[in-house]
């Protein structure tokens, strides 16, 4: 039985939008916590000749930042600040009752120095570092919508086409090849049908499903949460083993890839379904590995300095009762959990074999992982996660990931593969009509459309309408190209699903509101200069040049706008 481990790497555009607490420090922290440790782990496994067929998604907006000279400078400054903090922390600990934490302060200093050396080894270009591993055939890199726009709620088909097509083009520009796979932002999907997200708002009686845009953009597959497939209707493909296209009722198993069915039948696009059993073990602090008592406590931080010295400790313990962190013991637990995880995969494979690959019930019983019933050849366990879970939220997660691949190499029950290789070797023999939903809270769109965020959508929809109405004439006027291109960038940055998500969580609402309104205002001003009766094109050109220095992304966007405006695919 195949096993696909997929990671989704994303941050909104933060360069040139401040530093602390929510600006460039956001991406610099992610680089230290997750991206650099992950690259270090991949290199170590390569040296040890351990196969790591990871499927790694990097959103185009993140890839633009990771390849940026601005990021390189910001990261160097961040390293300097953090290393200075480590030195000051050691001095402050020495004269307090917390002197026993001094070895941990030195541990963090060594860790940061190692990461800085690695960063400089890559010349500060982390996108190129990930590209190296794909070119070596060790991982598969996949793409996403350009700025992680929440596709089901965008009002214009052209906007969806630009998000997907530009995302694909940017992936090709930065990583050197076309991606087969797509990470749908927030794993959000809607089928063909009526569209009216807000009662009384804009309505379209029959709108194309997301899979139609994905097909048009040239992608071969995406990932969905299990409830989108479980609630849909599955059927065998004509000519596949088992009969005709309507060959009887089929229980929708999460342990297979499906062709996504549209209104006219199966499309060329496939969907991998997230396994709820093994996934929960990895992401849940309450039920899974990250809540183990020996792992680093995320929430307790010592100020000044901002360093973490404590472990999770007893379940439910107060922050004041946390015990000192032991890195060696934590690494040992990561190995234990990796062995447990691979054993769990074996039990899932055994159950899938015993149920003929249906796997409709997700309870997995104990038992040896070494002698499962034969699972159907097309079976696959897919576990997609946010990359930032590993290292940032769960500090030991990167070590766990590396140990998982070591353990997988010691058994023969499940076979680790990239998503692309699974489909090449075992094409899907069933199709499914997916239902509307996402992998967010409640499994629907409510994290992005709710009373606290509803105000954002009419403003965004108005920008979409005026932009696409203005685009054809602006494309025909070279003097307007600079303004048109930057207006598109600002519109795309405003579309990032991050802003509604942050507002809904209540974490840093002011920052999300500021960024959303800022990009909307800039887009509105630039678009207004493209109107037939506009008299401020010169002022808009100056503003567009200023914004290009600030929001320096997607250098080839004008060609993508032209293709979309002409009704051509960007694949």
Task: Describe each region flagged by the PLM.
Residues 155-158, 163-168, 174-179, 184-198, ...:
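Non-catalytic regulatory/linker segments of enzymes
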Residues 70, 75-135, 141-155:
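Active-site-proximal, glycine-rich beta->alpha crossover segments in alpha/beta enzymes
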């Amino acid at each position: 039985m195949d096993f696909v481990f997929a990671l989704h790497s994303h941050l909104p555009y933060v360069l040139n939008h401040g530093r602390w607490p929510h600006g460039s420090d956001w991406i610099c922290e992610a680089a230290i916590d997750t991206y650099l440790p992950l690259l270090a782990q991949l290199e170590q496994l390569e040296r040890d000749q351990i196969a790591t067929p990871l499927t790694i998604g990097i959103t185009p907006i993140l890839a633009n930042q990771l390849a940026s000279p601005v990021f390189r400078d910001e990261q160097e400054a961040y390293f300097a600040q953090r290393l200075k903090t480590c030195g000051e922390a050691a001095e402050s600990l020495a004269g307090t009752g917390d002197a026993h934490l001094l070895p941990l302060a030195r541990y963090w200093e060594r860790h940061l120095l190692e990461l800085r050396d690695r960063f400089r080894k890559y010349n500060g270009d982390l996108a190129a570092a990930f590209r190296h591993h794909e070119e070596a055939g060790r991982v598969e890199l996949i793409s996403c919508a350009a700025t992680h726009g929440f596709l089901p709620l965008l009002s214009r088909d052209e906007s969806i086409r630009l998000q997907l097509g530009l995302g694909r083009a940017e992936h090709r520009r930065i990583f050197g090849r076309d991606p087969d796979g797509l990470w749908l932002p927030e794993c959000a999907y809607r089928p063909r049908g009526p569209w009216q997200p807000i009662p009384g708002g804009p309505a379209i009686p029959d709108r194309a499903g997301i899979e139609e845009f994905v097909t048009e953009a040239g992608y071969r597959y995406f990932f969905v949460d299990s409830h989108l497939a479980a609630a849909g209707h599955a059927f065998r493909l004509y000519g596949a083993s088992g009969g005709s296209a309507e060959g009887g009722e089929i229980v929708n198993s999460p342990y297979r890839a499906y062709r996504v069915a549209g209104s006219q039948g199966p499309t060329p696009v496939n969907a991998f379904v997230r396994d709820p059993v093994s996934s929960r073990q990895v992401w849940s602090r309450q039920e899974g590995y990250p809540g183990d008592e020996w792992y680093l406590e995320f929430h307790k931080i010592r100020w000044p300095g901002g360093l973490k010295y404590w472990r999770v400790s007893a379940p439910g313990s107060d922050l004041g009762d946390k015990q000192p962190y032991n890195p060696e013991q934590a690494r040992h637990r990561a190995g234990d959990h990796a062995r447990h995880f691979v054993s769990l995969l074996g039990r899932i494979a055994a159950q899938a074999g015993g149920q003929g690959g249906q796997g409709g019930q997700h309870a997995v019983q104990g038992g040896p992982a070494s002698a499962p019933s034969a699972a159907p050849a097309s079976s696959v366990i897919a576990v997609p996660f946010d990359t930032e879970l590993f290292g940032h939220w769960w500090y030991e997660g990167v070590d766990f990931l590396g140990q998982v691949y070591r353990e997988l190499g010691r058994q023969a029950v499940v076979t680790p593969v990239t998503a692309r290789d699974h489909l090449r070797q075992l094409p899907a023999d069933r199709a499914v009509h997916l239902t509307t939903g996402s992998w967010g809270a409640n499994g629907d769109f409510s994290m992005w459309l709710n009373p606290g965020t509803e105000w954002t959508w009419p403003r965004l929809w108005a920008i979409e309408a005026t932009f696409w109405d203005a685009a054809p004439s602006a494309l025909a006027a070279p003097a307007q190209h600079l303004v048109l291109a930057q207006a598109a960038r600002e519109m795309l940055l405003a579309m990032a699903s991050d802003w509604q998500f942050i507002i809904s969580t209540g974490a840093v609402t002011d920052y999300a509101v500021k960024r959303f309104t800022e990009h909307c205002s800039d887009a509105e001003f630039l678009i207004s200069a493209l109107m037939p009766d506009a008299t401020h094109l010169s002022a808009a050109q100056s503003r567009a040049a200023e914004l290009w220095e600030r929001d320096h992304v997607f250098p080839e966007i004008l060609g993508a706008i032209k293709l979309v405006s002409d009704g051509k695919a960007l694949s």
